[in-house]
Swiss-Prot record:
Keywords: Cytoplasm, GTP-binding, Hydrolase, Magnesium, Metal-binding, Nucleotide-binding, Potassium, tRNA processing. This is tRNA modification GTPase MnmE. It is found in: Cytoplasm. Its cofactor is K(+).
Length: 453
């Protein structure tokens, strides 16, 4: 592809020991001749002077030249590595611009060039930004896995399987004499079921990767005066919510964003759930349910002094029955300082149950470890791949088309409609890696990158 020659500072703005200027495009060699007086040997570090148009030395440092397509962007690339003073770097960029036909790079444009030149796919390009923005070791490991192609590999395997099945179905439709009763002999059904199972696994991994990157939304819910606001304060490490003995003190949604060992956690404190005629409180309860329905996890707060039950169905069946079927729930028996309960975690009917005292902090550290575990924190293991919300949406869309295709096969034996659903599934998956992606989406993704990346 033909691209502009672009330049940008690749290191962070400000004062530092080393500053790097990156140039990419067909005029990179012209810059080398103008600024260095010669073209460095490809892929070799060359210590030399960086000179102005009049021959004065601007700085001294190392020059690296990469001949396209054997470079990060796929274009000719020149890197000038000098001293990290911002004034010096600005002077050097100004000198590069004097060569002519060169412009300042837009945010993420070097990565965009690499994507357009097939040096990496879209998930790998996004992983560069995620690696830079990682807030914990787990996120960095996961981003690196994506950069190395782990996520792309999973998606490509799915695309290949869907494509092969689609071609088989279409061929059998076009040449019916070659395949008798091909829709009912079980071959297509078995292949389709395997793809659905594979996609389920990828979706689960992507959801975990998204939580590591974007954080987990945890909603604290329960009856009034169960200690929800006290737990919010204990997790946040500060007095974010007003705590009183008066039931219904919290009437609106309170939010805190914290990090557990660098992993982002979005905690939502909600109004106590109960039947009430108070209009303001009713609005707060409605907002509480809105937050619950969009949560990744619910901490069901129970006042341990009011019941000895641990099974949430026994504690409050109407509340549990109203929860989304796929929403994870952790039961928190609060006020252990008053009940004298042992601070231990138990499993009850598939629910994790923790005994704590939000007021004194007893058991809160164990609860934090539980939340870290839910977010995929692993202290000694390599991370899985990282994922973004758009990836989850594309996977969900692909899964929907597979389910529709399954219905066309099992209920209607409609080969043409099955093939169409497989085609739509293929398109949804290909959007993840950027094989079929709108220019608007590409612009949105790369514009969020750092300049110089």
């Amino acid at each position: 592809m033909t691209t502009d020659t672009i330049v940008a500072q690749a290191t962070a703005p400000g004062r530092g020991g080393v500053g790097i200027i990156r140039i990419s495009g067909d005029k990179a060699s012209n810059v080398a001749m103008a600024v260095l007086g010669h073209l460095p040997k490809t892929r070799y570090a060359d210590y030399c002077d960086f000179k102005s148009a009049s021959g004065q030395v601007i700085d001294q440092g190392i020059a690296l030249f990469f001949k396209g397509p054997n470079s990060f962007t796929g274009e000719d690339v020149l890197e000038l590595q000098g001293h990290g003073g911002q004034i010096v770097l600005d002077m050097l960029i100004k000198r590069v611009m004097e060569v002519g036909g060169i412009r300042i790079a837009k945010p993420g444009e070097f990565s965009e060039q690499a994507f357009m030149n097939d040096k990496l796919d879209l998930t790998q390009a996004e992983a560069i930004a995620d690696l830079i923005d990682a807030t914990c070791e787990q996120a960095a490991k996961s981003a690196l896995q994506s950069l190395q192609g782990e996520f792309s590999k999973e998606v490509h395997e799915l695309v290949d399987q869907v494509t092969n099945l689609r071609l088989y179905v279409e061929a059998a439709i076009d040449f019916p004499d070659e395949e008798v009763d091909f829709l009912s002999d079980g071959k297509i059904a078995n292949a389709l079921y395997k793809i659905i199972d594979k996609l389920d696994l990828v979706q689960a991994s992507a959801k975990q990767g998204s939580i590591i990157r974007e954080g987990m939304k945890v909603v604290i819910a329960g009856r009034p005066n169960a200690g929800k606001s006290s737990l919010l304060n204990a997790l946040a490490g500060k007095e974010s919510a007003i705590v009183t003995e008066i039931a219904g003190t919290t009437r609106d949604v309170l939010r805190e964003h914290i990090h557990l060992d660098g992993m982002p956690l979005h905690i939502i404190d909600t109004a106590g759930l109960r039947d009430t005629t108070d209009t303001v409180e009713q609005i707060g309860i409605e907002r509480a349910w809105n937050e619950i329905n969009s949560a990744d996890r619910v901490l069901f707060m129970v006042d341990g002094t009011t019941t000895a039950a641990v099974d949430p169905h026994a504690i409050w069946p109407d509340f549990v029955d109203r929860l989304p079927s796929n929403l994870g729930v952790t039961v928190i028996r609060n006020k252990a300082d008053l009940t004298g309960e042992d601070l231990m975690m138990t499993e009850e009917q598939g629910y994790s149950v923790y005994r704590i005292s939000a007021k004194t902090g007893l058991g809160v550290e164990e609860l934090k470890q539980h939340l870290k575990s839910l977010m995929g924190y692993q202290s000694n293991l390599e991370g899985g791949f990282i994922a973004r919300r758009r990836h989850l949406e594309a996977l969900e869309l692909a899964a929907g088309h597979l389910q529709l295709g399954k219905e066309q096969l099992e209920v209607y034996l409609a080969g043409e409609l099955l093939a169409e659903e497989l085609r739509m599934c293929q398109l949804a998956l290909s959007e993840i890696t950027g094989r079929f992606t709108s220019d608007d989406l590409l612009g949105k993704i790369f514009s969020s990158f750092c300049i110089g990346k």
